[in-house]
Amino acid sequence: MEYRSLTLDDFLSRFQLLRPQINRETLNHRQAAVLIPIVRRPQPGLLLTQRSIHLRKHAGQVAFPGGAVDDTDASVIAAALREAEEEVAIPPSTVEVIGVLPPVDSVTGYQVTPVVGIIPPDLPYRASEDEVSAVFEMPLAQALHLGRYHPLDIYRRGDSHRVWLSWYEQYFVWGMTAGIIRELALQIGVKP
């Protein structure tokens, strides 16, 4: 796939043709979800946030909108939509959910389900001052180019964990967020 010319139609066709395998073993039992917001344009964008530097966990990191599943959430999809509305003011009714990726174990003990959704291009994003310091859009074709991600092996508590890292403009994209973007690229058939 030529990543420089990815259209929204190409992305949707590839995503729907290659359904993800969800039967992954996970070590964590606490549930969380993130929304992967794809901005509806002929050349689609990927909406990302930078977390507030005042947060206890993952301060200042680039992330998708998301968080823990609450008792009031009907599903992981509902949790992702609720969190996206709380963090960046994306109304749930404007999100066209097209599917989910396999859950990912976070270092903080959550099983995180990435929910892929298409959002309108003209939404007035409003970052939650408590949680988000910036909202930015990255061209989806650039985000899904696997050559931009570099492996880094981190040793923690006697175990080795591979994380991926990249950057876009002044933003450093790494860890679970970079891993989810890579998983999305592999899901639509991008070759390493």
Swiss-Prot record:
InterPro entries linked to this entry: CoAse (IPR045121), NUDIX_hydrolase-like_dom_sf (IPR015797), NUDIX_hydrolase_dom (IPR000086), NUDIX_hydrolase_NudL_CS (IPR000059), Nudix_NudL (IPR023735)
Keyword line: Hydrolase, Magnesium, Manganese, Metal-binding
PROSITE patterns on file: NUDIX, NUDIX_COA
EC assignment: 3.6.1.-
One Pfam family in the UniProt entry: NUDIX
CDD domains in UniProt: NUDIX_CoAse_Nudt7
Domain Nudix hydrolase per the UniProt entry, residue ranges: 29-160
GO molecular function, one term: manganese ion binding
GO biological process: nucleoside diphosphate metabolic process
Cofactor requirements of the protein: Mn(2+); Mg(2+)
Domain of life of the native organism: Bacteria
SUPFAM superfamilies per the UniProt record, alphabetical: Nudix
Residue span of motif Nudix box: 67-89
Role of this protein: Probably mediates the hydrolysis of some nucleoside diphosphate derivatives.
Protein name: Uncharacterized Nudix hydrolase NudL
Gene label: nudL
